[in-house]
């Protein structure tokens, strides 16, 4: 355990597995469909996928991007979401390992960092799902943003040694994020007499503020103004 870098491979695999599930969430959540039933199946022929058809990234490559039954072309976005989530997971674990200059892991032990990593991974995973749903349908589901707005201050108790974010700055970030986007929405409506953003944007910025703090909101505003 003196060289925990080997666990980056585990973090990559962990992310790929969840990336496969996120593909299901992205496809089913907006319509209110069950995330567990029916099992993963080919949208063209309807056949339920075999376990070996559902191995993240590798199955798509082995099947050359086709259904294992009817050989209908399967979108490359499925393995890309899995790969993206795997890379984010590995990067996030590397960030956790380097917390406090890399001394935190030697002070508390590797296993003690798994919990904070899981919290951060859940947040990052939610952002992945939101991003692709927004790309597809131009909506940001409240089913995802609201729970993360509410849990941000609670998560801060465990994440403070890693992120430096306290529960109070988390609350302030959520309020600031929501207030800023509300002012933008109201200002746009006042000038243009029509809506420019929806309530989803309001919730999204509040969610980011809740988990990343006020500094994140300032950075987003500066980046958006460029």
Residue map of PLM features:
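Hydrophobic alpha-helical transmembrane segments
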Residues: 1-17, 153-163
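N-terminal membrane topogenic signal
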Residues: 3-7, 73-78
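Transmembrane alpha-helical segments of multi-pass membrane transport proteins and ion-pumping complexes
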Residues: 16, 20-24, 90, 174-182, ...
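Membrane-embedded alpha-helical segments in integral membrane proteins
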Residues: 21, 84-105, 153-157
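Membrane-proximal soluble regions of multi-pass membrane proteins
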Residues: 22-77
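Membrane-interfacial, low-structure loops and terminal tails that flank and connect transmembrane helices
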Residues: 41-44, 66, 101-110
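Select subsegments of transmembrane alpha-helices in polytopic membrane proteins
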Residues: 76-84, 142-144
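Functional transmembrane core segments of multi-pass inner-membrane proteins
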Residues: 102-107, 111-112, 117-226
């Amino acid at each position: 355990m003196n060289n925990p870098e080997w666990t980056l491979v585990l973090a990559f695999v962990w992310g790929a597995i969840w990336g496969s599930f996120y593909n299901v969430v992205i496809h089913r959540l907006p319509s209110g469909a069950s995330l567990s039933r029916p099992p993963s199946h080919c949208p063209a022929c309807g056949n339920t996928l075999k376990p070996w058809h559902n191995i993240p990234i590798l199955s798509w490559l082995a099947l050359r991007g086709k259904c294992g039954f009817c050989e209908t072309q399967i979108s490359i976005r499925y393995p890309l979401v899995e790969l993206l989530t795997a890379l984010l997971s590995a990067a996030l674990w590397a960030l956790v390992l380097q917390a406090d200059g890399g001394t935190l892991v030697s002070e508390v032990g590797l296993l003690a960092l798994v919990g904070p990593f899981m919290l951060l991974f859940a947040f990052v995973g939610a952002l992945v799902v939101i991003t692709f749903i927004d790309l597809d349908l131009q909506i940001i589901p409240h089913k995802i943003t609201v729970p993360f707005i509410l849990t941000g201050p609670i998560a801060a108790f465990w994440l403070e040694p890693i992120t430096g974010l306290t529960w109070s700055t988390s609350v302030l970030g959520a309020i600031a994020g929501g207030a800023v986007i509300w002012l933008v929405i109201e200002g746009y409506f006042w000038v243009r007499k029509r809506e420019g953003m929806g309530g989803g944007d309001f919730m999204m910025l509040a969610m980011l503020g809740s988990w990343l703090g006020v500094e994140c909101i300032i950075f987003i505003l500066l980046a958006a103004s460029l």
